[in-house]
Amino acid sequence: MNCFSFSFIIIVLCAGSSNAKFREKNSVVFKNSLGVKNVLKIHCTSKDDDLGYHYLRPGVQIYEFRFHDSVLKTKFDCELWQGRGPTYKFYANFRAYKSGGLIAHYGKKNIWEAREDGIYFTHGKEIPKLEYKWSPIGKPPSP
């Protein structure tokens, strides 16, 4: 890598550090917008952390966790189940958060909303859009 490239990277990192949001934690938020009596079961993990199981009733109940990005690529993978627990009928597994690599994010918000037809995503500034469909549990694949 030449001196110009290295200097440019240092300037970008320093400029990002001077941001007012510097060191503000990132967050992942889950909201249960499923039908009446449908519980949302959530389990998220990273390379270093298992955040345990969380159960959300329908309505305004949310689950949120906060963290700082690591230079070594912060990732959180989550599993979601929906149904009338303990019998869950639908499942989804996806990456709920991935850092930007060498340039850490600060104050980034990933909002996931579970609805009957799937899981919707937004950063909070735009209308949520459908990202993942639910997979039925225990149903053999159709031929």
Curated annotation (Swiss-Prot):
Which is a GO BP term held by this UniProt record? Answer: rejection of self pollen
Cellular component GO terms, alphabetical? extracellular region
Which compartments does it reside in? Secreted
Instruction: Cite the entry's keywords alphabetically.
Output: Secreted, Self-incompatibility, Signal
For this protein, the record's InterPro entries field holds: Self-incomp_S1
Q: Where is this protein primarily located?
A: secreted
Q: Please give the superkingdom of this protein's source.
A: Eukaryota
Q: Would I find Transit peptide among this entry's keywords?
A: no
Signal sequence coordinates: 1-20
Q: Is the keyword Secreted in the record?
A: yes
Database matches in PANTHER family: PTHR31232, S-PROTEIN HOMOLOG-RELATED (PTHR31232:SF39)
Q: Which family does it belong to?
A: Belongs to the plant self-incompatibility (S1) protein family.
**In its UniProt entry, what is this protein called?**
S-protein homolog 11
Q: What is the lineage of its organism?
A: Eukaryota, Viridiplantae, Streptophyta, Embryophyta, Tracheophyta
